[in-house]
Amino acid sequence: MYVFKALAGIVLALVATLAHAERIRDLTSVQGVRENSLIGYGLVVGLDGTGDQTTQTPFTTQTLNNMLSQLGITVPTGTNMQLKNVAAVMVTASYPPFARQGQTIDVVVSSMGNAKSLRGGTLLMTPLKGVDSQVYALAQGNILVGGAGASAGGSSVQVNQLNGGRITNGAIIERELPTQFGAGNTINLQLNDEDFTMAQQITDAINRARGYGSATALDARTVQVRVPSGNSSQVRFLADIQNMEVNVTPQDAKVVINSRTGSVVMNREVTLDSCAVAQGNLSVTVNRQLNVNQPNTPFGGGQTVVTPQTQIDLRQSGGSLQSVRSSANLNSVVRALNALGATPMDLMSILQSMQSAGCLRAKLEII
């Protein structure tokens, strides 16, 4: 009996060391409380000769004519305006939850034509619409571009992106979105990641603090909470719930591979079983040169001939069979994979093969 209690205490101690507490607000979000996307089309003026080439972007000229006509200025028909300080842009913003009329939000401005840079430009008044084609905000202001560039004599240098910028507090909310917050007696908490264990732990924590039946786990991602009626009561109720702490168990072992950049990221739960790996590299080098053959005598009547010369080199480095020991923690996994001497691109194929062979104890996600 005493041995059983001692073993149970050791197991509970190990579980406690593996788990750590996090607030419910860091693990969940309130269903329905989210941002909405806004988009608009506008003009940027005041560019230092880096705007759209209007002969190649007719929509810029058309937009400018429409804007001038609204201001009472008529451009004669057939006029070919050669402008370099105007650019057509797309403006995007995020409409925050519970936004009120008169509140300001940030906007992102991106070039739509062939403008070289938006640095120093000013966005003219641009209506921002939602998916329902209703105008919810108006954007205008000076654009802040984070990049820099210079060109002279056919040479150019550029740091970061010049065709996009940001206007802090550049849009004013003109229309409010209706909200259903406070209308019902239940609110759903959505977990950031689907996890049956975590959903049940959040449910138990709320029931212990607010009484049995206050929360119910609907599925692996949704926890339904009974709340008092009224906005102010629900705000106070959610504030208390979101600050509750829940013991978080270890996450699922996962390896994420970015197929575009070749980066590999794994969490600390990844483990390896013993296996043997052989990786061979195949490299092909193609070298093409143009040889110019001229006649020996200047006036002999011969012709200058350009003949291409191509060399192809094929090399294959055979990879020897290397043993990978079983690894119980992340540091051991990293050391075992580094011992293979594989590049990140090779490592992607190796990890896929390890999972197929049952040696990689983790979920493999390719993005």
Curated annotation (Swiss-Prot):
Keyword Nuclease: no
One function term, GO molecular function aspect: structural molecule activity
Similarity annotation: Belongs to the FlgI family.
Subunit structure: The basal body constitutes a major portion of the flagellar organelle and consists of four rings (L,P,S, and M) mounted on a central rod.
NCBIfam families listed in its UniProt record: PRK05303.1 (NF003676)
PANTHER family in UniProt: FLAGELLAR P-RING PERIPLASMIC PROTEIN FLGI, FLAGELLAR P-RING PROTEIN
Protein name: Flagellar P-ring protein
Organism: Salmonella paratyphi C (strain RKS4594)
Lineage: Bacteria, Pseudomonadati, Pseudomonadota, Gammaproteobacteria, Enterobacterales
Gene this chain is encoded by: flgI
